[in-house]
Structures are given as C-alpha cells and as structure tokens.
C-alpha cells in the first residue's frame, strides 16, 4: 500500500487526502444532523444538504435570487438591520450559474461549488508549501488543512473554500513574482469575501521588503511597476464593495453599518473605529481588567509566534501575509464565535505545524483536529434553541 501511495503523483495524493477528510467530516455532520431539532432553516433531523446550508447560506441564497436591497432595512430606533450587503456576490452568483446550467437545486449546487473550490484550495496549498518545504511536510500540511477544526466550513454552503482557493493562488503568484497575473486574481478575490485590504497591506509590505533587499535579490523596474500595480488593484478592489453598496443605497456608510448590525446583539449599535472592536469584544467577554490583559497577551503571543524557528521556515512573504491578515482582523473584526472561521485565511501557519516529522506528534495533531471539528460543529454549527454562537 505504501509503495502504491508513493508512486502516485502529488496531485492524486492531495485529492485523496482531501476526499478522505471530507468523508470523515460528512460522517460527523450526519451524526449532528440526525440530532438536529427543528429550527429557522430546517425541520427536525434534516438531510445533509439542508443541514449544510443553514446560517449564512440562506443569505447567499437571498443574494442569488433577490439581489441586494436598494433601500436598507431600518429598525424602529433608526439603526441599519442585518441585510444582504454583508455577503459578496461571486460565490452566490457562481452557484446560481451552476444551477442554470445543470438544473441542480440550491442546496446541491452550493455544496458542489464549495467542495470543488475546497479541492482546488488543497491543491494550491500544496503547491504553495512546496515553495518553502519538501514534499512530505507539504503533504502533511494538506492533511492538517483538510482536517482542521473549522474545516467543515469547506463543505457547507459558504464562500470560505472559494476564498481560500483565491488566497492560496494569490500567495503562490506572489511568491512566483507573477504580479501581472496576480491582478485579476486579487480583484475577483475581493468580491468573494472581504480580503482585498488585507492583501493590499501584504503586497505593500512585500514591495517594501523587496526594495530594501534588491541588492541580493534584484527587483527590476518592470517587476516594481507590476507589483505596485497589483497592490493598487487590491487596495481599490478592497474598497470597491463598500463603495458599490453606498452608490446603490445612497448611503456611503451602508456597508459598514450593515456589518456593525451583526455585533449589535453583543455591544449595541456603535460606530466603527479601527482597532477598537477587539478591545470592546474582550471587555464584553472578560471584563475591562482581564479583557485587557488577555488581549495584550494574545497580541504579544502572536507576534512572538511569527519569529519562532518553525514559522520562520515559511519564509518572509508568508509571514508578512500572516501579520497583514492578523492586523486587518484586529482593526475591523469583533471577536465572537465566528472568529474560528475567520482565522481560516491564516492557513499557511499549518505549514509550520507540519514540519516536525515525529509520528506520534503527527497522529496526535490529526486526532486533535478531528476532535476539534466535533467541538466546532457542536458549539457553532448545530442550532440549539435561541442560538447565539453562529459559525
């Protein structure tokens, strides 16, 4: 068996790993589906298709068939309420296109798109890891990617697998220094999920780093122009969706006010001030004293992790991406149960975890990851009464 496995091409190994992981996750999710009570999205004990298209999948369905509102829903108190502008168009319209071509229903089509892009993301992740480490570690990084605690999101009606596909492709093109090819990728990526601003920061840091190291690593004018162009494209695309929402609704703040409506249940309606959401969140969860201590400790710990020997072996560029995305989350995101899902774009960190070759260590990581899936599904996906822990 081992001999046959080693003779397989890398892409076949990656696809088999990801398929096996999805099979395990499907069994776990079916167990949860059997025990699922009637809720806002499904009846009791729904089939897999219904169970996997709860929560935000319904919003994507609304986008696909009802489009975006030109008039924002306003509460009696005058606040913007939750609406479709929080969900970007590439994933739902891709699903609708597949439905038109194949005749599939929404549940099936949304899962086909999500799972297909999950397979693609796994293939690109392997290629990305091969830029910085050997075949064995790269393949085990794919294993960790495939069985990660929040990996069930790769086989539900969400846009995350599509987002990770484009992030992996964009990072790979950056490491390959194919900046012109990168431009359309970052533009499309910015309309899958809000990623453009974080990637623009990463590309800006990448350009600065290449400029200061140009003596040992030449940075010719054509590459400079292309890299700066890709950075600008990502920056403009990152602001484009809020601008479009503002133009359609006539309210330039419509997108940010829509996003803020999701955290209002925790802290009420407040203005978005960069880098305050995590302070507000940690104070809400832990109180002002312990919240401040825990937040400072978390930021310091993450900064130190970026300089550990294993993470440094990922190379400067991937660490710049990790830092950029973390800074973006710190600036705009309110920490709650969706945090685990929103950490998914930091998947290059799995490459560092995959470097040690100790068999006990690797088996333990896989077992803990699969157990983590059960925890994530129990805490975040399964609907339990008046559920306040969305995935």
Residue locations for each model-derived region?
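Transmembrane-helix signature of polytopic, membrane-embedded enzymes
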Residues: 105-109, 125-147, 181, 316-320
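Transmembrane and membrane-interface helices of multi-pass
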Residues: 131-133, 139-157, 171-172, 191
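Membrane-lumen/periplasm interface segments of specific transmembrane helices
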Residues: 21-38, 200-213, 221-305, 318-322
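Short acidic/glycine- and proline-prone juxtamembrane loop motifs at membrane-interface regions
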Residues: 156-162, 339-340
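Transmembrane-helix motifs of polytopic, lipid-linked glycan transferases
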Residues: 97, 109-132, 303-307
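Short hydrophobic/aromatic helix or loop-helix immediately within or flanking a transmembrane segment
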Residues: 54-73, 77-103, 270-279
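Membrane-interface transmembrane helices that cradle and orient dolichyl/undecaprenyl
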Residues: 170-181, 357
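Loop-to-helix entry region of an early transmembrane alpha helix in multi-pass inner-membrane enzymes
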Residues: 79-85, 89, 93, 101-120, ...
């Amino acid at each position: 068996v081992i001999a046959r496995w080693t003779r397989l091409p890398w892409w076949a190994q990656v696809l088999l790993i990801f398929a096996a992981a999805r099979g395990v996750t499907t069994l776990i999710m079916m167990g949860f589906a059997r025990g699922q009570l009637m809720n806002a999205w499904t009846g009791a004990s729904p089939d897999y298709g219904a169970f996997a298209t709860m929560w935000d999948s319904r919003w994507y369905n609304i986008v696909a068939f009802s489009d975006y509102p030109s008039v924002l829903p306003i509460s009696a108190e005058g606040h913007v309420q939750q609406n479709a502008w929080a969900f970007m168009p590439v994933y739902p319209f891709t699903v609708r296109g597949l439905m038109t071509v194949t005749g599939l229903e929404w549940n099936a089509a949304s899962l086909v798109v999500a799972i297909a892009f999950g397979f693609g993301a796994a293939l690109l992740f392997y290629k990305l890891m091969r830029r910085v480490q050997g075949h064995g570690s790269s393949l085990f990084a794919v294993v960790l990617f495939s069985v990660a605690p929040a990996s069930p999101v790769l086989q539900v009606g969400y846009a995350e697998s599509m987002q990770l596909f484009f992030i992996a492709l964009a990072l790979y093109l950056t490491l390959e220094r194919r900046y012109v090819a990168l431009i359309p990728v970052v533009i499309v990526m910015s309309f899958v999920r809000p990623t453009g601003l974080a990637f623009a920061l990463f590309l800006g840091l990448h350009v600065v780093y290449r400029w200061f190291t140009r003596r040992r690593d030449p940075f010719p004018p054509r590459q400079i122009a292309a890299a700066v162009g890709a950075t600008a494209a990502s920056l403009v695309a990152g602001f484009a969706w809020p601008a479009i929402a503002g133009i359609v609704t006539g309210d330039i703040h419509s997108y940010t006010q829509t996003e803020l409506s999701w955290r209002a249940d925790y802290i009420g309606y407040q203005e978005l001030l960069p880098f305050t959401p995590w302070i507000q969140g940690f104070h809400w969860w832990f109180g002002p004293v312990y919240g401040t201590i825990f937040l400072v400790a978390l930021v310091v710990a993450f900064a130190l992790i970026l300089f550990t020997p294993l993470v440094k072996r990922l190379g400067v560029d991937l660490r710049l991406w990790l830092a950029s995305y973390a800074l973006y989350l710190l600036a705009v995101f309110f920490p709650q149960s969706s945090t685990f899902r929103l950490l998914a774009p930091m998947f290059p960190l799995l490459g560092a975890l995959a470097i040690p070759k100790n068999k006990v260590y690797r088996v333990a990581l896989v077992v803990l990851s699969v157990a983590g899936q059960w925890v994530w599904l129990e805490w975040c996906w399964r609907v339990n009464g008046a559920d306040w822990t969305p995935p």
